[in-house]
Amino acid sequence: MASDNDIYNAFKDATGVQKSLLRESSAEKALHEAKYVLKNDKLEEKDISFRCQYKAPYSVNSIKLSFNFKKNDYIPYRICAVVGKNGTGKTQFLSQLASSLSGLNGSDDEIVFEGKRPPIDRVMSISYSVFDGFNKVRGEQSIYSYVYCGLQTENGILTQDQIQRNFKIAYSEIINRDRFDDWENIISEVLESEHQDILKQIEADDFSNINWSSGQHILISTMTELVCNIERESLILFDEPEIHLHPNAI
């Protein structure tokens, strides 16, 4: 389909293509990137800005939202915030947005994009809240286009042992993917200077003797999962970031 426009045009709207082959956002992005690479012999720099309409549960009218990530010399373009009073549906919106952008739950009538779904490679959901509404798929159940980095599983809150196990898996993958320097720079910024010895203990595989607080454990584990899983054109959805937010992590 990437190399032959006739085949693409003949099958692009077929149910099997839309519901299976291109269901995940990463698959749709790969198709369009392949078409561009075959034509131009280089990767295209993407603008993942998008507009959508969201109909919250029990709401009569849809809400129009715009997310601008276009590069600008004067205004930062990497962060957008959703602000509203308690009970207005912010958490539900982020949950639905994660599913719609990644293709995790297939079609979703609650969120309608203006035009095509944005070319996002991977959606990463983070929450330190025990009430977050994100899909909790992990491990073998997860799909490439979606990663959950929160404190819960489908069966409840993660234990300290489970958090540490997830951390070890992510850290091992960081080493394998040659991302250690990036990880070390980020964790060094997160930790206070008097706690930098934690880094040395992690590098020495001395986990049993690490004297980290529960907050440090959660923060380092989450940042490690992020570094492990992030890709180009990833979108990180952070619900209630003020919970457990460490000053150095801002």
Which residue ranges define each predicted feature?
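Extended helical coiled-coil dimerization/tether regions that scaffold
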Residues: 4-73, 117-118, 130-217, 223-232
